[in-house]
């Protein structure tokens, strides 16, 4: 099972936590980051098989900031932690940029908050940017924007962020690197009879009972946050592997199909999960009417909706809102996330993408609704 899932994964999110990225909290572990960068580059280049698109979610900014500021212990005051994050993020980004460049790879720093992914317009902007970076062969290095929010420092973790990013880019797999070999039936540091869980269903309630409590004083996430992250990633069809980050060539060996760590299998296909998400959680804000040619292509081929095929726009919606796509008779063909607000969409009706910049003053997506954000109506 692990061989099939990881071998076939073409888009992967890798999350690495503070306890691995840092030298026991005393700044960044340069050798470890260099080693993961080497493996990331191998995956992107396809050194041992098919080329992959890889996103890195990395903690470590606060620990690096503490080192640069000369602090021995982790402060409790929120604004001190935010200041440390601001100082340390400089070093974290620089370290990844240096190590990936040594491997001939480009990198990009992306700072996100949970609010960015909860807002539909910002969600689409973040998604478009990340997918563009992946198409360019660049490795995005993502961290929580600790300087402007409190939630991650106080309660949250980058395991959750890793799962949200997996959902955002529709990853095939999430790999969480940790300081444990994987998920055990009990805490192996306290129970010598604890056994490694090789494979389970993501979302199995029994896993949470096994997971135990909080993590180290360096990071905030324990095994329970990884279980919950795997459950969240499974909601969009991504399976999760929890593995020891110090295992030699761990990433390369995983994508080659070697059974390392614990595999938590998603039970939902990606397309099914996306349909369920759009059907259950998003409110219809407006609609566009399309001509017969566009309607036929949508129904038969599931193509993206281009403005040139639109004849009318109904309602007042914003970029990122859910809209219906209707034929001339009013029958609903599909629903999807709008790349343009209603006022802009009206300007783009019947227009080719080559005219967008002249009409809008900027050039963005060529589609009104991208096929990845489009769900055909039942019976279409």
UniProtKB/Swiss-Prot annotation:
Catalyzes the transfer of a phosphate group to glutamate to form L-glutamate 5-phosphate. GO terms for biological process: L-proline biosynthetic process. Pfam families: AA_kinase, PUA. Residues 285-363 form the PUA domain. Keywords: Amino-acid biosynthesis, ATP-binding, Cytoplasm, Kinase, Nucleotide-binding, Proline biosynthesis, Transferase. Substrate binds at residues 59, 146, 158. Its main location: cytoplasm. Belongs to the glutamate 5-kinase family. Pathway: Amino-acid biosynthesis; L-proline biosynthesis; L-glutamate 5-semialdehyde from L-glutamate: step 1/2. It comes from the Bacteria. One of its GO terms (molecular function) is RNA binding. It catalyses: L-glutamate + ATP = L-glutamyl 5-phosphate + ADP. PROSITE patterns: GLUTAMATE_5_KINASE, PUA. It is found in: Cytoplasm. The keyword Zinc does not apply. This is Glutamate 5-kinase.
